[in-house]
Amino acid sequence: MAETILIETKTAGGNCRSYLMAGASYLGILCFVPLLMSRDDEYVYFHAKQGLVLWMWSILAMFALHLPGIGKWLFGFSSMGVLMLSVVGLVSVALRRTWRLPLISHVVALI
């Protein structure tokens, strides 16, 4: 059987600050703001760790540009993947849910 892509783990019970911090987690380098400032909020920390992995993936994709031949393709596909997963993360914050993103959740579990 196919595993579902979005897995709802829990709902958030926080305030507006928690939602803004969780949303900032998926906006590139801004993932460090909630990661450093909201370690005590489990909801924000969950999203911050996923945002950190997405940011690291985008940095690695930039290094792929230096590969001759396949670098531009690899960068393009990686950038599209990061963009789509960031949008899914922002949607999960807008719906006040925590969804484990595919491909990312395995790396987040190691952090």
Swiss-Prot record:
It is found in: Magnetosome membrane. GO terms for cellular component: magnetosome membrane. Induction: Part of the probable 4 gene mamGFDC operon. Its main location: membrane. It comes from the Bacteria. Keywords: Biomineralization, Magnetosome, Membrane, Transmembrane, Transmembrane helix. Disulfide bonds: none annotated. Subject to cleavage or degradation; identified by N-terminal sequencing of proteins that are about 103, 92 and 15 kDa in size. The chain crosses the membrane at residues 18-38, 51-71, 73-93. Disruption phenotype: Normal magnetic response, no change in magnetosome size or number. A double mamF-mmsF deletion has a normal magnetic response, slightly smaller, fewer magnetosomes. Deletion of any 2 genes encoded in this operon (mamC, mamD, mamF and mamG) decreases crystal size regardless of the protein combination. Deletion of the mamGFDC operon leads to smaller magnetite crystals in irregularly spaced chains, but no other phenotype. Residues 1-17, 72 are cytoplasmic. The keyword Electron transport does not apply. It is a multi-pass membrane protein. Residues 39-50, 94-111 are lumenal. May form homooligomers. Belongs to the magnetosome MamF/MmsF protein family. This is Magnetosome protein MamF. It comes from Magnetospirillum gryphiswaldense (strain DSM 6361 / JCM 21280 / NBRC 15271 / MSR-1).
